[in-house]
Every structure is written in C-alpha cells, then in structure tokens.
C-alpha cells in the first residue's frame, strides 16, 4: 500500500491532515486510516458541470476514507465519525465532501484473505494516512 500523497494539491493535503487529526481525537482504538478512490488514484474531479437531459448538474470528488479500528462497535464508530464530519465542515474553506467507511481490523483482514474485490482494490490503490503499527493487513 502506498504511503505518499504528494501528488495531491496543497488544499487536499491540508484537509486530509486535519481529518486524520480529528479522527484520532475522537475515535478510540483507531488502527489505520486509508484514503482510497479517486483522490488516492489521482483521478479526482475538483468541480465539473454537465448538462444531463436538459438539467445542469455539478459534480466533485469526495475523500473516501476507510477507518480501521480494533475492539470497537462499528455503529458507535460511525456516530463518532459523524462528529468528525460536523467539525470539519465548521471551517468554511473545507468544501470537499467526506465519505467514511469503518471496519474492525479482524473483519477487514478476513475480507482481504477471502479476496473480496472492494477491499483488495483498496489495499492495492489506497494510501495509508495513519497506521498505529499494532496490526498488519493480510
């Protein structure tokens, strides 16, 4: 898995550093934070407008983040991540949407060992933003 996000624009680097700090402040037993999707691949869209069937629509990529915990109820972690969202958007210059997925490390490693495509693609294309060093991915 990659660890560098030097290909990202400065605003994204700053946003991600802020988001990681907020997650670590609020989510106990956070073991890993992984950026995946278009920002990890470098195919993100900052803003695009299209006319679809006569309706003007806009689109922008979001930050897709997998938050990996140990010994935590994933529903409770989901609620804690909602507070990260709230805090992040209180700053008016933070405009890129965040999409969180959270999983327990045991479930994630089980999914990886079973070859589940979604998780293996994250492992191949993702960027490790934070790693506690307590666990390894299968």
PLM regions with names:
Residues 117-123:
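A conserved SF2-helicase RecA2
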Residues 43, 112, 116, 133-134:
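Solvent-exposed, flexible loop/coil residues
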Residues 123-138:
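Catalytic cores of NTP-dependent nucleotidyl/adenyl transfer enzymes across multiple folds
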Residues 2-27, 53-113:
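Metal-dependent nucleotidyltransferase catalytic core
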Residues 31-45, 49-52:
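Short gly/ser-rich loop at a beta-strand->alpha-helix junction or flexible surface loop bordering the NTP-binding
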Residues 36, 101-105, 132:
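Conserved beta-strand termini and adjacent loop/short-helix elements that scaffold enzyme active sites
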């Amino acid at each position: 898995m990659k660890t560098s996000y030097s290909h990202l624009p400065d605003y994204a680097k700053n946003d991600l550093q802020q988001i990681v700090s907020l997650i670590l402040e609020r989510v106990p037993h956070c073991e890993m934070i992984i950026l995946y999707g278009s920002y990890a691949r470098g195919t993100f869209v900052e803003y695009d407008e299209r006319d679809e069937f006569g309706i003007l629509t806009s689109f922008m990529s979001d930050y897709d983040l997998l938050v990996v915990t140990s010994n935590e109820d994933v529903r409770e972690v989901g609620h804690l991540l909602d507070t990260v969202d709230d805090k992040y958007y209180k700053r008016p210059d933070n405009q890129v949407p965040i999409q969180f997925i959270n999983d327990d490390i045991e479930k994630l490693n089980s999914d990886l060992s079973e070859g589940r495509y979604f998780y293996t693609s994250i492992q191949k294309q993702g960027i490790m933003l934070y790693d506690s060093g307590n666990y390894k991915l299968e």
